């Protein structure tokens, strides 16, 4: 179509007609016509689009569908395209747009079109408020205020709709604005004559409160609107409108404190609606959601209303009984996903969350009797619901259920024999969930009865759905079951699994049924993964059948089976090891290559993809360097998957509603009626592909070198891929391994790659919002420094890093202060304390990563980094103050330990900061703190120089006192104690003039060997070798009396795997043993005091050293 004339001039009649025809073509049923119209529309200049669309919206003769399309396009233009279009309109056109829009809203008679015009009005208003909150459309605001003061109900509706769409329209709200807003909402929410007005005002009030979620004072001011909102919730539900109820759920989730003054009323209303079977399932679920959400977001408040929770429990359980008599369930060959819209699934989830939110002390007494009654019911639906309720409350009621776990488990096991298959399946699900919730004590206590019962259920060929549930439960049980316990049942388990595999393979060939077989191969993989080399005797009976499944599963509907079986084969191969697997390796690799070739020509969401990716990684681990020949075939699709960009969109709420049924999209509400959407399908595959690339770089090194540059260019930008945490984790984890690969090509190539990585990695430490991801990024940075070595950071990098670490430490202290404030609040209780402790653990974990980064800097830069470090010194000193929590003191001491170890003798300049904390913390109640202090005292002796002599002298009595403490060797204390023993050894070795060596040595020898701390153990053995090789009389003892003790120390060192083949100390110790063997009498005296295991350990030591 022709472009319109000059700015501000009206378009010609023919141009208008062309544009109207274009709008009609945009809604034409023909795809080709629509596509052509879209291309024409995209090429129309913004000025012309704006004027044409506004004219079409106002033209009542254009037809409703055309006007509707024009309204949608204009809203989109002023929303997502505002910055490109509106500022470039001439001032007079901007003025005309605003005037015309007010007139259009004011004069529109069609209710639906008026709402669309209000949406456009709100979008424009939102974009005409700047960052400071100034409204640049005062005429629009005046129109709204005039509408509020008018007696025209239609204009009230206009004002409410705009305000609901954009609650920030008043900009910087002063007292006068708040009074206007409250008057508008109050007068409309009380309107008994117009239900639509009352509903809309309640939604607008909720949206306004949500938009001001941090303004606690406003909550009090607007609290008297709550009765009207609750009344509107009730009334609208019975008019088949759940929009206000949805708003109430949002308030419960985001601003629960607003509900405080009327919490009882809110809960009573929710309880009433939840229990009313006349309402739709969705409405009842939403009403329940209000209660459940408050249990999570306002736990202390809700615990004051347990009477209402107790009344809600029967409603929840009744909803869980709402199941269909589905004859197809028994014969289904697909494991359908849970229907989250069903009452049963929604209620089960609600009970789970309620238990976790309020805890077992509250929930278990309310549910136990109801559940027991349901389990005794003749109705299979009640028995099913009772079992699923037990499954749901386990996590939240963990502590309270443990004492009754025996009777609970025995009760559940009985239902594996229930006449109804769905009850048997529910019993399997419940056992699986308990195995998760109560692990590992559940496995240790019930291994015999649970494994036996699940195997028996799997062997029952009556129903493959039940078999599949039993096999799934067994997988979950195995995950946390000690290997030593699984071995007890291995023979029976393998026999059972193999016989079922043979039957299911025949069923696949004969009938094409696959459901139980899909789960069975996963169970076999789980068993092999758990028992590792113990699977070798059974390898030959499973592998032929597994390969046969892969060969058979070629049809489209068998792709998932094929993928899971490939995964199983790779798990089995990894379990039995390269030597055993090599007989099938070539054949298996050909099967994988065939599948890989097929995948390259298949859809992105093919279910085999994720299984293939992880299977290749396991094959790499099995084959080692032999895998390099296959890497070119694997790497291309892997990089393609890892590089895939997700579809994203910024949409108005109305557009989201139109897309809500679209597969694979998830939306986050950004407020102001805007949502950010991302198509999630493919994100998991992308994360898995990234993790596999990390794995290949780590395992193959030289074999991965040629892909290093391509992968690093892809991975570095993914440090900012905020759509999926595991993608960022993989990107961070990859960096040190990619640097190791780059090093193979020489220092210049390595330096160039580090320049590309370093800056984004540092920035990611400063900007990453997720604690778990942040810890991985910090860990990666620390490892990268160690790879690159001294001088790898320039002044700009060090300055930025210093600022970031300083901010992390300051944030750490600030968060601790805030937690102390919360402990003084009225609502503080055990549940709040648990939440605060979780927060504290996250903060401490980041503190450990700060320590890791500083460790890397100290170990690579040595004393040259100390001038930079001094900006952090006051914060580190603050960590070791006696008033700080013990983890702070532990990690503060660890940082000073690193300074002493790597920056001495210069470290002595800081001695007054850490001298007394180091000595005093030797008496701390927490072994972690004692360990850090003891290690520091040891490295003072080893690396500190003469300046530390007096401090080492002071340390010895404190170290001895810890070692001699009655409970020093308990599991909790042993690591700290062994660090004390090692520290004394270091003082004896490196600062002998600080102590009476001959007096202390006999005690030190009596404390050996060290069992738990392998690093310190090998240091003590090296010192022992020094003493023996120098024939130190105190160590050798009169008439060689100490040699039996020394021989036992050496034997224990081998048994504890302290002594390894590679360690030079092994040869020294072996020579000591051989020297003693030269005297037959002495040797017999030494070995007579050893048990068989110790003698075997000595024999093994002599054979390799």
Swiss-Prot record:
GO terms for cellular component: cytoplasm; nucleus; synapse. HEAT repeats lie at residues 219-257, 361-399, 402-440, 444-483, 866-905, 908-946, 949-987. GO terms for biological process: protein import into nucleus. Pfam families: HEAT, HEAT_EZ, Importin_rep_4, Importin_rep_6. The keyword Transferase does not apply. Keywords: Acetylation, Cytoplasm, Nucleus, Protein transport, Repeat, Transport. It is found in: Cytoplasm; Nucleus. The modification N-acetylalanine is found at residue 2. It comes from the Eukaryota. May function in nuclear protein import as nuclear transport receptor. Belongs to the importin beta family. This is Ran-binding protein 6. It comes from Mus musculus. The lineage of its organism: Eukaryota, Metazoa, Chordata, Craniata, Vertebrata. The gene is Ranbp6.
């Amino acid at each position: 179509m022709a472009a319109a004339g000059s700015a501000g001039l009206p378009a010609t009649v023919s141009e208008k007609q062309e544009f109207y025809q274009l709008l009609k073509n945009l809604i034409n049923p023909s795809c080709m016509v629509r596509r052509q119209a879209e291309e024409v529309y995209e090429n129309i200049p913004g000025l012309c689009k704006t004027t044409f669309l506004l004219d079409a919206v106002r033209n009542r003769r254009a037809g409703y569908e055309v006007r509707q399309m024009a309204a949608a396009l204009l809203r989109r233009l002023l929303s997502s395209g505002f910055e490109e279009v509106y500022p470039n309109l001439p001032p007079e056109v901007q003025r005309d747009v605003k005037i015309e829009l007010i007139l259009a809203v004011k004069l529109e008679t069609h209710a639906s079109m008026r709402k669309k015009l209000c949406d456009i009005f709100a979008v424009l208003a939102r974009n005409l408020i700047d960052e400071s909150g100034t409204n640049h459309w005062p005429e629009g605001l005046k129109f709204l205020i005039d509408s509020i003061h008018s007696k025209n109900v239609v204009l009230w509706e206009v004002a409410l709709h705009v305000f609901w769409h954009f609650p920030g329209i008043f900009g910087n709200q002063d007292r006068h604005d708040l009074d206007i807003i409250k008057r508008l909402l109050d007068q409309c929410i009380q309107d008994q004559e117009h239900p639509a007005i009352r509903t809309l005002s309640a939604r607008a009030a909720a949206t306004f409160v949500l938009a001001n979620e941090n303004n606690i004072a406003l909550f009090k001011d607007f609290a008297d609107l709550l009765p009207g909102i609750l009344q509107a919730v009730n009334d609208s539900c019975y008019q088949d409108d759940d929009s206000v109820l949805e708003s109430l759920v949002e308030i419960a989730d985001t601003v629960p404190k607003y509900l405080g003054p009327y919490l009882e009323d809110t809960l009573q209303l929710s309880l009433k609606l939840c229990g009313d079977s006349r309402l739709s399932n969705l409405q009842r679920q939403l009403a329940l959601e209000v209660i459940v959400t408050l249990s999570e977001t306002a736990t202390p408040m809700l615990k004051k209303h347990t009477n209402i929770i107790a009344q809600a429990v029967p409603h929840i359980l009744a909803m869980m009984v709402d199941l269909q008599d589905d004859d197809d369930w028994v014969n289904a060959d697909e494991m359908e996903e849970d229907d989250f819209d069903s009452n049963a699934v929604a209620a089960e989830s609600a009970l789970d969350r309620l238990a976790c939110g309020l805890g077992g002390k509250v929930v278990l007494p309310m549910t136990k009797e109801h559940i027991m009654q349901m389990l005794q019911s003749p109705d299979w639906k009640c028995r099913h619901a009772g079992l699923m309720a037990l499954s749901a409350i386990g996590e939240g009621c963990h502590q309270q259920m443990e004492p009754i776990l025996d009777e609970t488990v025995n009760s559940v096991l009985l239902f594996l024999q229930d006449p109804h298959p769905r009850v048997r399946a529910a019993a399997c699900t419940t056992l699986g969930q308990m195995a998760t919730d109560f692990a590992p004590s559940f496995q240790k206590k019930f291994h015999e009865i649970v494994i036996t019962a699940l195997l028996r259920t799997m062997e029952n060929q009556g129903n493959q759905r039940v078999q599949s549930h039993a096999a799934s439960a067994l997988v979950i049980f195995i995950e946390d079951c000690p290997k030593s316990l699984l071995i007890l049942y291995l023979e029976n388990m393998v026999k059972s699994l193999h016989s079922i595999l043979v039957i299911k393979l025949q069923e696949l060939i004969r009938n094409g049924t696959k459901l139980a077989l899909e789960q069975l191969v996963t169970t076999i993989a789980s068993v092999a993964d758990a028992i590792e080399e113990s699977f070798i005797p059974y390898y030959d009976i499973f592998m032929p059948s597994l390969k046969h499944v892969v060969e058979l599963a070629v049809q489209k509907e068998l792709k998932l089976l094929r993928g899971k079986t490939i995964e199983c084969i790779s798990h089995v191969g990894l379990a039995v090891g390269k030597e055993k697997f090599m007989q099938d390796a070539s054949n298996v690799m050909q099967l994988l290559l065939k599948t890989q070739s097929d995948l390259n020509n298949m859809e992105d969401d093919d279910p085999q993809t994720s299984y293939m990716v992880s299977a290749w990684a396991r094959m790499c681990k099995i084959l080692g360097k032999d895998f390099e020949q296959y890497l070119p075939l694997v790497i291309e699709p892997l990089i393609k998957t890892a590089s895939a960009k997700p579809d994203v969109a910024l949409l108005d709420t109305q557009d989201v509603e139109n897309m809500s049924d679209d597969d694979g999209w998830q939306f986050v509400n950004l407020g102001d009626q805007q949502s950010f959407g991302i198509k999630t399908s493919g994100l998991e595959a992308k994360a898995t592909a990234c993790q596999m690339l990390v794995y290949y770089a780590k395992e193959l090194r030289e074999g991965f070198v040629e892909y290093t540059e391509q992968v690093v260019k892809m991975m570095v930008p993914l440090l900012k891929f905020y759509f999926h945490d595991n993608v960022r984790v993989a990107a961070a984890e990859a960096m040190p391994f990619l640097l190791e690969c780059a090093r193979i090509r020489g220092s210049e190539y390595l330096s160039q790659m580090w320049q590309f990585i370093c800056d984004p990695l540092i920035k990611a430490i400063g900007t990453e919002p997720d604690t778990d991801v942040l810890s991985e990024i910090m860990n990666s940075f620390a490892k990268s420094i160690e790879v690159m070595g001294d001088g790898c950071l320039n002044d700009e990098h060090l300055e930025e890093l210093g600022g970031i670490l300083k901010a992390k430490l300051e944030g750490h202290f600030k968060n601790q202060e805030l937690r102390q404030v919360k402990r003084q609040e009225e609502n503080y209780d055990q549940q709040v304390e648990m939440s605060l402790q979780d927060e504290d653990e996250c903060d401490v974990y980041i503190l450990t990563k700060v320590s890791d980064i500083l460790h890397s800097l100290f170990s690579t830069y040595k004393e040259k980094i100390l001038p930079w470090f001094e900006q952090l010194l006051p914060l580190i000193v603050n960590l070791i103050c006696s008033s700080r929590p013990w983890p702070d003191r532990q990690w503060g001491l660890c940082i000073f330990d690193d300074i002493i170890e790597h920056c001495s003798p210069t470290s002595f300049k800081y001695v007054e900061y850490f001298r007394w904390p180091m000595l005093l913390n030797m008496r701390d109640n927490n072994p972690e703190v004692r360990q850090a202090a003891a290690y520091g005292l040891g490295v003072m002796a080893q690396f500190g120089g003469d300046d530390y002599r007096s401090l080492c002298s002071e340390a010895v009595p404190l170290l001895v006192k810890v070692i001699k403490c009655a409970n020093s060797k308990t599991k909790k204390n042993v690591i700290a104690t062994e660090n004390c023993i090692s520290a004394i050894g270091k003082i004896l070795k490196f600062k002998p003039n600080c102590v009476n060596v001959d007096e202390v040595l006999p005690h030190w020898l009596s404390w050996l060997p060290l069992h738990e701390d392998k690093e310190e153990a090998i240091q003590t053995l090296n010192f022992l070798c020094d003493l023996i090789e120098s024939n130190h009389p105190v160590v050798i003892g009169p008439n060689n009396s100490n040699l039996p003790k020394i021989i036992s120390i050496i034997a224990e060192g081998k048994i504890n795997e302290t002594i390894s083949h590679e360690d030079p100390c092994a040869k020294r110790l072996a020579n000591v043993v051989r020297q003693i063997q030269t005297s037959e009498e002495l040797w017999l005296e030494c070995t007579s005091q050893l048990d068989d295991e110790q003698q075997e350990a000595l024999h093994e030591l002599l054979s390799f050293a």
